[in-house]
C-alpha cells in the first residue's frame, strides 16, 4: 500500500489543494508541518528548495501543481479524458498566473512584507481578480454542470473554490458580483467529504 507524506508549514496556502484531494478521495496520509525556524536546515534536502513536497513511499515530489496533478490522476479527478485533463490544466495555469499577479498584495496582507495593503488592493488585487474571475465566471456559465470541466468534480474545482472562500473571509465586495463563482464554491464545499474536512481542519491563518 502506498504511503503518502505531505511536508509543509502550518498554513493552508500551497498545500491545501493536496489536503483537499486526499479528503475527497478518503485517502489516509501523514503530514509534517515545519516551523519557519526548522525550515532553513531542511531546505537543501528538498527537490527545489521550497515547500510543499509530497513523499510517495519516501520519494519526494516538489511543486504544488505537480503534486495536485499527480494526486488527481491517482484518484480520478484529473478529467475524464485527455481533452478534459487539458482543459483542467489550462484553467489551473490561468489561476496560477492570477496568483502571481496578485502576490504583492497577498504577501503584504499576510504580513510577510511591509507595504500599503489598501493601495495594493486598489492597484493590483482588484483589477487582476475581476479580470480573471470574469474568465472563470464565463467558463462556469458555458459548462452548465456547476463544475469547471465536464460533469463531475476535478482538482481545479477544489483549487479555485478554496481561494474564493479565502477571499470571502477577507473581502466580500470584490467577489459578490460573480454569482456563478459563488454558487460553484457552495456546490464544491457542500460535497460531504469536503464539508467534513473543512469543518475539522486546523484553523490556519491562510
Swiss-Prot record:
Keywords: Transferase. Residues 2-79 form the GST N-terminal domain. Transmembrane segments: none annotated. GO terms for biological process: glutathione metabolic process; innate immune response. InterPro entries: Glutathione-S-Trfase_C-like, Glutathione-S-Trfase_C_sf, Glutathione_S-Trfase_N, GST_C, GST_superfamily, Thioredoxin-like_sf. GO terms for molecular function: glutathione transferase activity. Conjugation of reduced glutathione to a wide number of exogenous and endogenous hydrophobic electrophiles. This is Probable glutathione S-transferase 6. It comes from Caenorhabditis elegans.
Amino acid at each position: 500500500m502506498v504511503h503518502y507524506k505531505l511536508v509543509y508549514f502550518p498554513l493552508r496556502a500551497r498545500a491545501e489543494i493536496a489536503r483537499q484531494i486526499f479528503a475527497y478521495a478518503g485517502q489516509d496520509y501523514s503530514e509534517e508541518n515545519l516551523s519557519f525556524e526548522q525550515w532553513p536546515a531542511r531546505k537543501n534536502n528538498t527537490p527545489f528548495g521550497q515547500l510543499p513536497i509530497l513523499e510517495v513511499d519516501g520519494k519526494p515530489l516538489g511543486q504544488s501543481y505537480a503534486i495536485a496533478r499527480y494526486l488527481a490522476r491517482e484518484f480520478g479527478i484529473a478529467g475524464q479524458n485527455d481533452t478534459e485533463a487539458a482543459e483542467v490544466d489550462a484553467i489551473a495555469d490561468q489561476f496560477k498566473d492570477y496568483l502571481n499577479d496578485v502576490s504583492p498584495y497577498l504577501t503584504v496582507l499576510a504580513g510577510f512584507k511591509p507595504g500599503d495593503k489598501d493601495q495594493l488592493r486598489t492597484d493590483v488585487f482588484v483589477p487582476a481578480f475581476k479580470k480573471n474571475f470574469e474568465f472563470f465566471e464565463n467558463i462556469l456559465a458555458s459548462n452548465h454542470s456547476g463544475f469547471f470541466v465536464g460533469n463531475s468534480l476535478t482538482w481545479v474545482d477544489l483549487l479555485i473554490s478554496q481561494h474564493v472562500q479565502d477571499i470571502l473571509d477577507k473581502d466580500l465586495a470584490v467577489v459578490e458580483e460573480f454569482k456563478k463563482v459563488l454558487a460553484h464554491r457552495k456546490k464544491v464545499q457542500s460535497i460531504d467529504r469536503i464539508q467534513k474536512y473543512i469543518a475539522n481542519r486546523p484553523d490556519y491563518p491562510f
